[in-house]
């Protein structure tokens, strides 16, 4: 929700000012979900204005996470869907448990990823796999995710946080200023300077279409959508 996204952005801002912190681990509460992404009821009930507000919040929060001056690690302990996967994509390193499921299912409900998914995913897995994941809605398991470069390590269930913390502790052996400069240089190698802003306008424009409304309503009604391509 908006509170969580703004909270993440605020935390990153505080950590960037703390000279004692150079690693960050993000994981989900409980045992089932890393993050299920946005609540579609917000888009259904709030319309275009809510869509713009929420997509902007996703964009700003994950851009801030991607620009964290230290090392960020996602400990994926369950389902990472939509915005949940985009949160992991904004991290520097991803560790996933065997039970994890990763997907960007937005087109199934007439939407598109609005937290950097279409921009960041191709850099990790290549254009072909990015298209397969986004355009088909395929759910990726850890073995395949590791093979295509979507995650850096697969671990047993219940071990993602410990593994992520171990990686984070190794950061203490590195020069903080070197880490920051290396990240900056790697980011500069990207073609687009503003990847998180690329999705904002197309995402909001979808709310002018009948298919967007039908997709969300069908999901909430637990039925198959009747696409009109309009």
Q: What residues fall within each predicted segment?
A:
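Terminal low-complexity tails and localization/encapsulation signals of metabolic enzymes
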Residues: 217-230
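Conserved CoA-thioester-binding segment of acyl-CoA-metabolizing enzymes
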Residues: 1-27, 49, 63, 151
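CoA-thioester-processing core
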Residues: 61, 65-67, 75, 81-135, ...
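Acidic, divalent-metal-coordinating active-site segment for phosphoryl/phosphodiester hydrolysis
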Residues: 138-144
């Amino acid at each position: 929700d908006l509170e969580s996204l703004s909270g993440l952005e605020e935390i990153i801002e505080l950590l960037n000012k703390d000279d004692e912190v150079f690693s960050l681990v993000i994981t989900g509460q409980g045992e089932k979900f890393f993050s299920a992404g946005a609540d579609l009821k917000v888009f259904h009930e709030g319309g275009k204005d809510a869509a713009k507000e929420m997509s902007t919040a996703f964009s700003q929060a994950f851009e801030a996470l991607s620009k964290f001056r230290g090392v960020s690690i996602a400990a994926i302990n369950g389902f990472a869907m939509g915005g949940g996967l985009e949160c992991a994509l904004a991290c520097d390193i991803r560790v996933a448990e065997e039970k994890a499921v990763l997907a960007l299912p937005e087109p199934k409900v007439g939407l598109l990823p609005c937290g950097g998914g279409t921009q960041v995913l191709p850099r990790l897995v290549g254009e072909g796999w990015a298209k397969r994941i986004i355009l088909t809605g395929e759910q990726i398991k850890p073995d395949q995710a590791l093979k295509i470069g979507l995650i850096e390590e697969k671990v047993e269930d219940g071990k993602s946080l410990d593994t992520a913390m171990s990686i984070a502790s190794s950061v203490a052996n590195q020069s903080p200023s070197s880490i920051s400069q290396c990240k900056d240089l790697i980011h500069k190698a990207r073609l687009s300077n503003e990847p998180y802003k690329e999705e904002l306008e197309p995402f909001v424009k979808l709310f002018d279409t009948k298919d967007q409304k039908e997709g969300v309503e069908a999901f909430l009604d637990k039925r198959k959508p009747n696409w009109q391509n309009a």
